[in-house]
Amino acid sequence: MADIPHAVLSERFQECMAGRRLVAGVFLTFRFDPAFFEQEVLPVFLDIPLSHATTIKLVQLEDALRSLPHRVAVYYDQNGIVPEAGPAKLDVERLAVRHRAIFHPKNIFLLVEEEEANDGERKQALLVACMSANLTRSGW
């Protein structure tokens, strides 16, 4: 039987992002904590130096999001907002999925490109993660 990979999610994603920069991102989750996503998850994919002061960090993240060629979006179950979640403060597309069933995926789709251009072009790749982690402190 194949070994199931074990790793700290943020560290594994940082390894995958090495030498690349984010072009666009789509996150699918059942449970969602907007403040945790903005403060702890999103910085992993932007790879910029950030202040430890929350208000300054938010400004830095907003500037980084504005510089992306495309948007970042989070799709979550309409009933999946964590009750103790902090409010969203960044310009991230947040889309509550409403239907009769439960929206329960936990996937990440990242369009990335090489940081360094080769002959004026940057190769792009789609990074896909299928996992069991919600975008919450306890899930991540």
Summary of predicted features, one role per range:
Residues 1-140:
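PLD/PLD-like phosphodiesterase catalytic module centered on the HKD motif
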